[in-house]
């Protein structure tokens, strides 16, 4: 374990003493440091009628237990404080450590003993994470140190778990959206699942916009998947034009219906544990799946601003600007009289994507988004540089396949009976509009590009993204984060994992940082919390996070690739082609070992190479035919210890998100030896070699200069490392699988790898 503490708010002595007193700690500025520490420790053992017993189980020195120490005349020292602090946080002498000083250095322990600062040290210790993954104060509250009185209690600028999660209100309302996406002449109704604590105070809301939450149709999804085996189409030379079109909602009328009291209820919904954490701290949770999902009406429009509007309508309802009904019969309306109107959205992948889309509407009431692994342009999710390009791990998927997966109205037999025929018509229109034949950008994709509206974002923004996420690739967060207005508060956590959540990792206090931010934004708490704009997980060692100023630098270093002419054959033998088509992982293994159809260049680094931004391959290339697909991957190659991309569980249920509520495992990325690490990758239809909107012809056997931008990253390579460049055509995981007989030739003498370099 290593501390990377970003959530602690430096506190004055007077404020620290006041907060400790509010928690029931009997500390006194007039007492000695030793007396205050003893009083603090005895309070920790509030379950015991006799605190001597648990105190005797701690050691103050290698040859003295804590009880004996406090009964002695010996003075408090750094050695004693450090040893007791470690034990209070769950570290066991002789098991987790033998030499406390060396262990504290390894931990990067954030508290440095000064006898005159003992009150502040105790305050800081309570806000520091235990070995279990919880802060000490959260651990104590979870054990019942504070009663669940359904009111707010704060410590170090963060809300504590004092809301009773055993007496939650679970209710359903149906919000009227200014849409008619299924063209039935009726405004669409949006089902909203609400979970909130009982409270006399208006509550802020965490809203998870999740098209998955009302169920998914995997059977329809699998039937809709596309075969990837097809020839690369030769496109006509042309210029693509699109236009920015404002979304115009339909008119709605003020509701004059009586207020209803009997709301639909539910017992369970698959929740997000970060939401659960905040539910116990006085934040209502709502789950909304939007148009075209079970319990709602409308068509699944998948990514456009009509779908976004169906979530926006819920925020409007929370602020009294939209109508909600008690049921589909629309006999009574219901008002969000429990809400304070301030909302933060949460969730990963499609969920985080909807958060980004919502933020670009500038809707009043949306105070903050926490968007994890989020899409900012749907074209860049299913296409790349004029190519059909599947998200990592999902060859054959496209946006209409996702529509089939999430149109959960068809999981309700009655809805299927009444609406499926019309749904299939709308789905066919969507399939035509996305133009899988060419892979080109068009109006359909432009209408699903949130980047063009980034300037309208006015809420606070928090993004997390994995630099090993080849599903929602790093370009998605790179482009939206760098497009955000300079006038807003923005934060980015870049980790070394894949498509994963990071709130329960051991090495980063993400939950606590979000707590401090949300108390500021949604509860109006003046806590003086300041979070760095960007925090990056160091790839060279375990559990190390660093502040960064920018994602993408203008300083570059050009690396020569060699002097040879390299030939890349596109065609595989029939058996090999079929085998790779059945198992794209086998093709990746062959590719990384240099056993596929490829050009391979190894560069031994003579100095450190700190990459920050978008690597570009500038290549002199020609094709034997009038078409060509170019793929590239950059590897950190050679055996050494690296971070894994999938977090592993260190414990099974050590994190309590309330008071014995929604327990979850503590996780972390492992640090272990492997043979390589993908740094970046990229794909291009050579007919789109100049830009996305220009379709060019490819002259047979004529040299072309191509600039292939790869996925942005921040990655530190060290002197002596090997940078492996792999150039090839078909990628069996991502691109169409064209097995026609053509070849690409690369002139390495006129080619470079252009690397953005991080400044010191």
Curated annotation (Swiss-Prot):
Active-site positions on this chain: 349 (charge relay system), 469 (charge relay system), 499 (charge relay system)
GO biological process annotation, one example: proteolysis
Subcellular location: Cytoplasm
Enzymatic reactions: Hydrolyzes Xaa-Pro-|- bonds to release unblocked, N-terminal dipeptides from substrates including Ala-Pro-|-p-nitroanilide and (sequentially) Tyr-Pro-|-Phe-Pro-|-Gly-Pro-|-Ile
Database matches in SMART domains: PepX_C, PepX_N
Alphabetized GO MF terms: aminopeptidase activity; dipeptidyl-peptidase activity; serine-type peptidase activity
Top-rank EC class of the record's enzyme: hydrolase
UniProt keyword terms in alphabetical order: Aminopeptidase, Cytoplasm, Hydrolase, Protease, Serine protease
EC number: 3.4.14.11
Record's keyword annotation contains Hydrolase: yes
Pfam families noted in UniProt: Peptidase_S15, PepX_C, PepX_N
GO CC entries: cytoplasm
Role: Removes N-terminal dipeptides sequentially from polypeptides having unsubstituted N-termini provided that the penultimate residue is proline.
Quaternary structure and partners: Homodimer.
Sequence similarity: Belongs to the peptidase S15 family.
PANTHER family registered for this protein in UniProt: COCE_NOND FAMILY, PUTATIVE (AFU_ORTHOLOGUE AFUA_7G00600)-RELATED, PEPTIDASE S9 PROLYL OLIGOPEPTIDASE
Name of the protein in its database record: Xaa-Pro dipeptidyl-peptidase
Organism (species): Streptococcus pyogenes serotype M12 (strain MGAS2096)
Protein's gene: pepX
């Amino acid at each position: 374990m290593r501390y990377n503490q970003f959530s602690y708010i430096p506190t004055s002595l007077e404020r620290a003493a006041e907060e400790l007193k509010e928690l029931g700690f009997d500390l006194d500025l007039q007492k000695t440091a030793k007396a205050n520490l003893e009083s603090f420790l005895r309070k920790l053992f509030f379950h015991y009628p006799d605190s001597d017993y648990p105190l005797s189980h701690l050691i103050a020195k290698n040859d003295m237990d804590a009880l004996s120490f406090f009964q002695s005349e010996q003075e408090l020292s750094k050695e004693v404080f450090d040893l007791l602090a470690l034990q209070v946080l769950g570290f066991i002498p002789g098991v987790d450590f033998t030499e406390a000083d060396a262990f504290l250095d390894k931990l990067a322990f954030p508290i440095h003993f000064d006898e005159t600062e003992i009150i502040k040290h105790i305050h800081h210790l309570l806000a520091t994470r235990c070995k279990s993954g919880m802060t000490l104060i959260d651990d104590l509250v979870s054990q019942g140190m504070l009663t669940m009185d359904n009111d707010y209690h704060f410590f170090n600028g963060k809300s504590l778990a004092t809301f009773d999660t055993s007496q939650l209100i679970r209710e359903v309302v149906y919000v009227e959206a200014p849409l008619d996406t299924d063209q039935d002449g009726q405004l669409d109704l949006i089902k909203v699942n609400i979970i909130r604590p009982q409270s006399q105070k208006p509550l802020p809301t965490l809203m998870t916009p999740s098209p998955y939450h009302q169920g998914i149709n995997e059977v329809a999804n699998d039937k809709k998947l596309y075969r990837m085996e097809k020839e690369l189409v030769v496109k006509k030379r042309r210029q693509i034009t699109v236009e920015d079109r404002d979304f115009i909602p339909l008119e709605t009328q003020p509701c004059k219906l009586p207020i209803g009291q009997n709301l639909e209820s539910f017992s369970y919904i698959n929740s997000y544990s970060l939401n659960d954490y905040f539910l116990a701290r006085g934040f209502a949770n709502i789950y909304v799946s939007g148009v075209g999902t079970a319990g709602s009406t409308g068509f699944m429009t998948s990514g456009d601003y009509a779908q976004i509007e169906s979530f926006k309508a819920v925020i409007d309802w929370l602020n009294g600007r939209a109508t909600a009904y008690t049921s589909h019969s629309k006999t009574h309306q219901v008002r969000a009289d429990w809400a304070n109107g301030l909302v933060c959205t949460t969730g990963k992948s499609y969920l985080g994507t909807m958060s980004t889309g919502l933020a670009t509407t500038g809707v009043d009431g949306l105070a903050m988004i926490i968007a994890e692994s989020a899409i900012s342009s749907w074209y860049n999710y299913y296409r790349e540089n004029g190519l059909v390009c599947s998200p990592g791990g999902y060859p054959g998927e496209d946006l209409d396949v996702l529509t089939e997966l999430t149109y959960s109205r068809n999981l309700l037999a009655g809805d299927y009976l009444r609406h499926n025929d019309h749904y299939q018509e709308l789905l066919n229109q969507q399939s035509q509009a996305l133009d899988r034949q060419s892979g080109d950008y068009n109006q359909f994709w432009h209408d699903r590009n949130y980047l063009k509206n980034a300037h309208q974002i006015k809420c606070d923004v928090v993004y997390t993204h994995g630099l090993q996420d080849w599903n929602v690739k790093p370009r998605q967060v790179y482009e939206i984060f760098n497009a955000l207005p300079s006038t807003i508060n923005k934060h980015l956590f870049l980790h070394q994992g894949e498509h994963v959540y990071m709130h329960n990792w051991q090495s980063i206090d993400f939950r606590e940082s979000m707590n401090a931010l949300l108390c500021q934004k949604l509860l109006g708490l003046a806590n003086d919390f300041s979070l760095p704009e960007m925090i990056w997980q160091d790839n060279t060692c375990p559990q190390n996070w660093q502040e960064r100023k920018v994602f993408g630098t203008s300083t570059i270093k050009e690396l020569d690739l060699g002097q040879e002419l390299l030939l890349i054959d596109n065609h595989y033998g029939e058996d090999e082609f079929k085998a790779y088509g059945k198992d794209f992982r086998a093709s990746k293994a062959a590719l990384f070992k240099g056993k596929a159809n490829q050009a391979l260049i190894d560069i031994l680094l003579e100095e450190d190479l700190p990459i920050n931004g978008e690597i570009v391959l500038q290549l002199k290339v020609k094709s034997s035919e009038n078409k060509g697909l170019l793929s590239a991957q950059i590897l950190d190659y050679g055996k050494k210890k690296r971070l894994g991309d999938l977090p592993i569980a260190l414990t099974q249920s050590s994190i309590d998100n309330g008071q014995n509520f929604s327990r979850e495992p503590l996780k972390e990325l492992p640090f272990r030896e492997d043979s390589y690490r993908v740094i970046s990758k990229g794909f291009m239809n050579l007919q789109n070699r100049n830009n996305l909107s220009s379709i060019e012809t490819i002259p047979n056997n004529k040299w072309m200069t191509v600039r292939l931008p790869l996925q942005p990253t921040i990655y530190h390579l060290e002197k002596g490392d090997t940078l492996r460049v792999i150039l090839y055509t078909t990628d069996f995981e991502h691109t169409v699988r064209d097995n026609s007989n053509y070849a690409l030739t690369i002139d390495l003498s006129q080619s470079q790898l252009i690397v953005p370099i991080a400044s010191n």
